[in-house]
């Protein structure tokens, strides 16, 4: 049986991959990574360090479009509820990749015990494909406990830069459209050019009129009813201090969402 691990570029999926490689061997394991064309440059260093540690080659896929290009082609402003980038740049090509492989296959995803609510959908979707089962190596005994960076650091692999800056993920150079207000504040503080590029794109989409005029990447839920909160209007909210530093990892669902 062949084992396929989808790597997100984060530490949790790296620990999951290591467990699969240890249990089944590199000769029976394929590691797959989808590049969104928006990644932080240090993510590539992290992947290269993992390849050197495991002595394997990671299969890399790149559509060529950025998440914002995917969203613009779909005539939407992406947010936590609607993010076609995840499906178009990661899920769909991964499905095509595993569909053409000889079966049986076990697909391994890097979700841990804190994310059990996220396991149901990808397990059901991938197991629709004949000959495929889904497993979650971080749930094997002993159950992997976050922060997973402690494990990758024990291999001599440096933690990705975004975690060190306090981001809870290593997605899209800190620009994940599913992230919350604090992460956008953090991006504005640590990578102002990246923040402005997204904020300017969002404003341009809203100015096109139609349904997009009333949507935004972020929502203001301060008064209980969610309303659009354009990034250009985002400031550090009164009484809320932005804290930089390390963070728990991989708390934003991206790859496995449908």
Language model feature labels by segment:
Residues 1-258:
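Nucleotide-activated chemistry modules centered on ATP-dependent adenylation/adenylyltransferase
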